[in-house]
């Protein structure tokens, strides 16, 4: 047991440097009602008169008292400074820094002064603790907490809810699972009414860390004793019940020493409780508390060891990120540049050490831009967006010039499809911009997660960011130009012989043929019946032949009628061809879109002159040929509908081919001219711009507080390693 005292003391000192909030050691918390003898028990354990005593409420602030065992031979006690003190026992307050107290009357007075400074001088209570450490060869290594006694009625400056405030204060200390509760109860009160045991059971229902102390054994009524209570027959306590005899107020007034009090206590126990004398008393209480503390520490060692290891790993990682002081600046600069370039490329490739889990980044995000954002944007572009029937008809008529069109002009198709292809340029350039932005974000990602060493050198970090940003900025116009050229290439030559386009035209031809057959099935019988009704016995030719010029000249009013029909056709926008004539619409696609024989027969039938009576003067109207034709809302003729349908299908077919090409070629161009180029030239660009002897000192200048943070991390790591070593020593002792 004695061998463990210096080890436990070292452990306590080490964790005092770490901080009690980081690692909480087991401590003894004294609770009880007001004037039950809590402070007297503490004084007996310390062996000195150091706590304020009196009637009523005396302890008005929590007192954290740490007892530190020192050897008898060590007469000169120092604090690590030049000044020391020649004494066997001394105390030190946390709020007075390094000031030492050898007179325990001064310690008691300082406690009173510090209490009044915070709590006032009229029985006020404060939750702010007083920290006191006592060094003595007469104590074992214990940490004790003296708390204000529980009360019911407020007095002096105490608030109305003083009972609730003190209760919450006590619960805050005893709720710590690493604490041992010392429940103090006066022997001259009923054990069943003990407030200390009641509040202890609230946080420790199993009684695994509660020790009962019975005070004032010498003040019981004549003829009674505490034998049943001390034996645990009234209320059993798992850790035991220990009786003690405190000094009375008369003994204190007479300056009776603690040593004399302990001697008289032993004599009293031998006389009144001879069978229990060796298991009661202040000395036995001290040994029991020490044993409980040791076992409690043993139970907490695994958790303490784990927490120390976690903290040590954190501070080791932090210290590594701070790095060692730079000796070879040239090698350090080259190493940092190379590491950044490698991490940047690895982030793009997806092999980086630190992989983001909350969102896509690096190469994965670039892939998403190519195949999701850019792909969906292109697919959302309507092949016929911005075109209507009037636009198509106008383009067809403008492409024919002054000549009537026999076929749909190919130039009208090219004009319209180029207009649609041009719409693919804007989303393509936007794709380049998104990839450029993502490569900018990769710079920050590498700085924050991958190469934390750069945080040591803020100027180097800024310089690297500037060089990479400039490199990306230089590649942006080149990439945009290439993407622009890809669209321009598609606009430069409309390849109507493209295999996919020919296949589409073949499918379209089959569809149109089917529609024509359906239309012919409806119109051919009516044309034949009309031909039979218009025959003259011997004057007209067969219906299958065209009328001769002589026959046309003989028809009454034919010239006037033809002129009127032409005029009417021009005014109605028929393109110089009669509405009823079904002309082939192949233009330069004759081999793709063919006219059936049946349709040619129907065209011949419709081209035959139909005798018409001379126009009535009252129904005629004048036509001004100098007027500019204006669009007229009307129903499209069959030919116009067919021409628009053909152009729309051809535009859609060719647009889909071009869109597929753009969707495939733009990501390739971006990868070659931007992404891969930056990957290949990044390190050489960084070395060329930054690896210069004139820039070494400036770039490798650490931030002002880096040295201080490195020292603090090293000190904390050393303290944690010392604590880990002490725990290992405790485990190796025979006690465990």
UniProtKB/Swiss-Prot annotation:
Region named B domain: 502-569
Molecular function GO terms recorded: GTP binding; GTP-dependent protein binding; GTPase activator activity; GTPase activity; identical protein binding; lipid binding; microtubule binding; protein homodimerization activity
Annotated crosslink Glycyl lysine isopeptide (Lys-Gly) (interchain with G-Cter in SUMO) location: 532, 535, 558, 568, 594, 597, 606, 608
Catalysed reaction equations from the record: GTP + H2O = GDP + phosphate + H(+)
Result of changing residue 532 to R: Some loss of sumoylation in B domain. Complete loss of sumoylation in B domain
Effect of residue 395 to D: In EMPF1; the mutation acts in a dominant-negative manner; defects observed in both mitochondrial and peroxisomal fission; reduced oligomerization, decreased mitochondrial recruitment
Known outcome of mutating residue 568 to R: Some loss of sumoylation in B domain. Complete loss of sumoylation in B domain
Subcellular compartments: Cytoplasm, Cytosol; Golgi apparatus; Endomembrane system; Mitochondrion outer membrane
Chain spans, region Middle domain: 344-489
Segments forming domain Dynamin-type G: 22-302
Region (G2 motif): 58-60
Ranges where the record places region G4 motif: 215-218
Outcome when changing residue 2 to A: In OPA5; changed localization to mitochondrion; impaired mitochondrial membrane fission
Designated name of the protein: Dynamin-1-like protein
Gene, per the UniProt record: DNM1L
């Amino acid at each position: 047991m004695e061998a463990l005292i210096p080890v436990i003391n070292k452990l306590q000192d080490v964790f005092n440097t770490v901080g009690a909030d980081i690692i909480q050691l087991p401590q003894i918390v004294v609770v009880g009602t007001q004037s039950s003898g809590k402070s007297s028990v503490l004084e007996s354990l310390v062996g000195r008169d150091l706590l304020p005593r009196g009637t009523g409420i005396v302890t008005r602030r929590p007192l954290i008292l740490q007892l530190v065992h020192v050897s008898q031979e060590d007469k000169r006690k120092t604090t690590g400074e030049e000044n020391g003190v020649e004494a066997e026992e001394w105390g030190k307050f946390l709020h007075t820094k390094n000031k030492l107290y050898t007179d325990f009357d001064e310690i008691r007075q300082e406690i009173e002064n510090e209490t009044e400074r915070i709590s006032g001088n009229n029985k006020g209570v404060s939750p702010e603790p007083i920290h006191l450490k006592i060094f003595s060869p007469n104590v074992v290594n214990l940490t004790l907490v003296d708390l204000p006694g529980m009360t019911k009625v407020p007095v002096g400056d105490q608030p109305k809810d003083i009972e609730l405030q003190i209760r919450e204060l006590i619960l805050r200390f005893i709720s710590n699972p690493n604490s041992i509760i010392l429940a103090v109860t006066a022997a001259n009160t009923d054990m069943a009414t003990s407030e200390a045991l009641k509040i202890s059971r609230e946080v420790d229902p199993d009684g695994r860390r509660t020790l009962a102390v019975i005070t004032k054994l010498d003040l019981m009524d004549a003829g009674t004793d505490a034998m049943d209570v001390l034996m645990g027959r009234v209320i059993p306590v798992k850790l035991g019940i220990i009786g003690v005899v405190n000094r009375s107020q008369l003994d204190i007034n007479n300056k009776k020493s603690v040593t004399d009090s302990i001697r008289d206590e032993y004599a009293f126990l031998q006389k009144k409780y001879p069978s229990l004398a060796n298991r009661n008393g202040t000395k036995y209480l001290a040994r029991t508390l020490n044993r409980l503390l040791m076992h409690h520490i043993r139970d907490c060692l695994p958790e303490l060891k784990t927490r120390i290891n976690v903290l040590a790993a954190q501070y080791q990682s932090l210290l590594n990120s701070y790095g060692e002081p730079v000796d070879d600046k040239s090698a350090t600069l080259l190493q940092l540049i190379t590491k950044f370039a490698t991490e940047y490329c690895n982030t793009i490739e997806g092999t980086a050490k630190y992989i983001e889990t909350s969102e896509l980044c690096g190469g994965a995000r670039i892939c998403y831009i190519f195949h999701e954002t850019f792909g969906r944007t292109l697919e959302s572009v309507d092949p016929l967006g911005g075109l209507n029937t009037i636009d198509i008809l106008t383009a067809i008529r403008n492409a024919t010039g002054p000549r009537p069109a026999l076929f749909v002009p190919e130039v009208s198709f090219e004009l319209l499809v180029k207009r649609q292809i041009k719409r693919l340029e804007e989303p393509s350039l936007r794709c380049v911009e998104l990839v450029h932005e993502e490569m900018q974000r990769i710079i920050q990602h590498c700085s924050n997660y991958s190469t934390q060493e750069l945080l040591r050198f803020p100027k180097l970090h800024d310089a690297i960011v500037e060089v990479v940003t400039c490199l990306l900025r230089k590649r942006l116009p080149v990439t945009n130009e290439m993407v622009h050229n890809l669209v321009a290439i598609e606009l430069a030559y409309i390849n109507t012989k493209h295999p996919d386009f020919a296949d589409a035209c073949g499918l379209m031809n089959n569809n149109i043929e089917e529609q024509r057959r359906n239309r012919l099935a409806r119109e051919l019988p009516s044309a034949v019946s009309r031909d039979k009704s218009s025959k003259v016995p011997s004057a007209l030719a067969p219906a299958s032949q065209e009328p001769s010029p002589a026959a046309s000249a003989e028809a009454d009013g034919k010239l006037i009628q033809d002129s009127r029909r032409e005029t009417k056709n021009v005014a109605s926008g028929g393109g110089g061809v009669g509405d009823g004539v079904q002309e082939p619409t192949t233009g330069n696609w004759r081999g793709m879109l063919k006219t059936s024989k049946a349709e040619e027969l129907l065209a011949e039938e419709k081209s035959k002159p139909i005798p018409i009576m001379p126009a009535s003067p009252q129904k005629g109207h004048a036509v001004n040929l100098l007027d500019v034709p204006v669009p007229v809302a009307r129903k499209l003729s069959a030919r116009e509908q067919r021409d628009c349908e053909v152009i729309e299908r051809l535009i859609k077919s060719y647009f889909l081919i071009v869109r597929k090409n753009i969707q495939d070629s733009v990501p390739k161009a971006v990868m070659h001219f931007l992404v891969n180029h930056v990957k290949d030239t990044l390190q050489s660009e960084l070395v060329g711009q930054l690896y210069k002897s004139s820039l070494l000192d400036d770039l490798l200048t650490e931030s002002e507080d880096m040295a201080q943070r490195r020292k603090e991390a090293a000190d904390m790591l050393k303290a944690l390693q010392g604590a880990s070593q002490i725990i290992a020593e405790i485990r190796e002792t025979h006690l465990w």
